[in-house]
Amino acid sequence: MKISILGGGGTRTPLLLKGLLSLEEELELEELSFMDMDEQRLLLVKRVLDEIAKEGKGKLRLTYTQDIRESIREASFVICAIRVGGERLRIIDERVPLRFGVFGQETTGPGGFSMAVRTIPRVWEITNLLAEVNPKAWFINFTNPSGVVTQAILGYSSLKKVVGICDAPSSIHKVIAQFLNKKEEEVFTDYFGLNHFGWIKGVYVDGEDVLPSILELIKDLPDFERITRFPGEFSALIKMLPNPYLYYYYFKEEATKDLLRAERTRGEIVEEMNAKLFHSLREGSNPLSIYLDYIKEREASFMPGRLKGIALAEGEGYIDVALKVIKGLAKGDAEVAIVNTRNLTAISGLEEDDVVEVPTLFRKDFLRPLSAGKIPAESLAMLKQLKEYERLLIEGVATSSYSTLLHALTLNPWVPSYHIAKKILDAFIEEEQEYFPHPG
């Protein structure tokens, strides 16, 4: 089997390789092709990858290329993890909304909007090429904003063998299992929503829903609010555990004030860490040690505190989901993972072709989202608004329509008014004009 990794110079790529090595014999892996347009970055990450590869059986070939056709040809799976515009434009995504008192974040809100406008056309180019060169391959999308990008692929390309992956739900599952002192496979999290916009409405152990007990425990647990920023009583109020990104929706004012007080955005922190990593890889003699130090620093910067006894490594959620998906689709053993896929009938009240984030069953070359059952009316109303925003955003990109993009941004839950939406959009056009249509 051959697997292609687009964006192979990314900082999570070594973690992905480590995970794939654990399935080297089971999947009969023969080649991993790492493709990246940034040759220098790819060659520096190659130093780390070559060291990690020594842990394998020695039969797996690692190849490196800037030729996307070469990389995707004959691959069974194509993993897409690109960042159009790099960290520089991520920072602009975060900073522009703040000028107008609106929270900026790279995957949701106006920041995610801008990232989607830049990213979707490039992903369409890739998927159109894949449909021409290797239409039988499965396309696994890591590229953010994952849900919107996956929706754009399934709605506007001929590819149907597409899965979108985000680490948030699987990371929540891991934390819950550790909190309950259970193995991950002993716990089922009844999750529903969209990417970075979902809830856990049940946690099942031995057939019993233990979520009510969890909500009661965390209500008076100081560490819970310190780590998640959600007051324990809030989860008890909605009777669900919210995805951490829902903090930006339920607590917009607090989230915006926190970021306005901060000296640097998340993108600026990551940019500095990445620059330090690549400088050290260029100058240092022990690439694997340098990389592991980087991962520890990034992990600590993202989650400075933890619940006692609970640990989660940087990137661990992404890799575990990817391995489950690949193993299930390739081998046929039943696997269940929370991914972004077509709704079908999983969430009643949304359209069949809406991309949702739900537990999904994987078998050989087959997937089927599991039914979410009855969900709260308030959640469905929020999902419908965000889904309409996503549809208009993708339509605006497809038609290069300023007015449609403005309509979409006006519907974004983070944006308080039409006038603010217009100011933000016009500012993005000024800062990132090569990616945006102009008015008129």
Language-model regions, residue ranges each:
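N-terminal Rossmann-like dinucleotide-binding module
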Residues: 3-28, 32
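NAD(P)-binding Rossmann-fold cofactor-contacting core
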Residues: 27-50
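A short helix-to-beta-strand connector/capping loop
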Residues: 54-63, 185
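Short acidic low-complexity segments
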Residues: 61-74
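Short glycine-/small-residue-rich Rossmann-like dinucleotide-binding loops
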Residues: 76, 83, 144
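Rossmann-fold NAD(P)-binding glycine/threonine-rich loop
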Residues: 88-156
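Internal, well-ordered domain-core segments that constitute the primary functional module
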Residues: 126-207
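Long, compositionally biased stretches enriched for glycine and/or charged residues
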Residues: 181-440
